[in-house]
């Protein structure tokens, strides 16, 4: 395990003779409301970045990369961006695209990404409605009784904890998220000091570490203040 001196990022390298090389950038993203801001961020950072200003780099990688795994995942307390490939050049390119996406996404210059992936108004035949990729996804999720039960149990069991919130977003709360709060969440939580990076497999250490350092060295270490505190006992 390593710590990047300049940025405070932590890295775990599992040195194994496995040709399937893997990389993951993970961030501790503790929800503070039901707006699903981290779910929307997970979608949005993969909609173009500083070095890769295309509309959907994720889709381009799906079409042209030799990847064996490519995804982004939102959990109740973290967001992960894993990639894998057996081809060394392809693996480094996947790392580069994902690092650029999480640290330098186009969301700060293009509010339309937030509107597309989060929520926006639409007018059809004189009827004003709300739409958005994540909003519509969570409307579908909330149509499942099991999902509603799990959310209710989390609120009851963790009333003083981030786990009481719906990390994916409550369709009733998502439209209250502003663009300003959205970009502020990225600046606060997507900092190397709040990240945990993972490398696994038969990688070229010098090339991989140099690529990581090129991105991480652009940040100064901070205290991210994202500790998870234990839930005090709850009286039934």
Segments the model singles out, each with a brief description of its role:
Residues 35-47:
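Active-site recognition of the HExxH zinc-binding catalytic motif
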Residues 26-36:
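Short pre-active-site segment immediately N-terminal to the catalytic Zn-binding motif
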Residues 19-23:
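Short, conserved catalytic-motif segment at the N-terminal edge
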């Amino acid at each position: 395990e390593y710590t990047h001196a300049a940025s405070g990022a932590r890295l775990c390298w599992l040195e194994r003779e496995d040709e399937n090389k893997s990389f993951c950038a993970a961030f501790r993203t503790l929800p503070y409301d039901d707006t699903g801001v981290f779910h929307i961020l997970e979608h949005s950072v993969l909609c173009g970045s500083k070095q890769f200003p295309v509309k959907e780099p994720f889709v381009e990688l799906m079409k042209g990369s030799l990847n064996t795994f490519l995804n982004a995942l939102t959990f109740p307390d973290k967001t992960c961006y894993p990639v894998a490939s057996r081809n060394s050049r392809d693996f480094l390119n996947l790392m580069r695209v994902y690092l650029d996406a999480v640290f330098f996404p186009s969301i700060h210059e293009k509010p339309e990404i937030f509107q597309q992936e989060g929520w926006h108004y639409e007018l059809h035949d004189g009827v004003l409605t709300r739409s958005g990729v994540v909003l519509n996804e969570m409307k579908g999720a909330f149509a499942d009784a099991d999902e509603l039960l799990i959310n209710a149990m989390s609120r009851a069991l963790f009333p003083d904890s981030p786990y009481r919130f719906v990390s994916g977003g409550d369709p009733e709360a998502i439209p209250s998220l502003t663009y300003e709060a959205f970009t502020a969440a990225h600046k606060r939580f997507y900092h190397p000091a709040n990240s945990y990076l993972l490398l696994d497999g038969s990688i070229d250490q010098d090339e991989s570490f140099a690529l990581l350092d090129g991105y991480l060295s652009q940040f100064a270490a901070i205290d991210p203040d994202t500790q998870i505190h234990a839930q005090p006992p709850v009286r039934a």
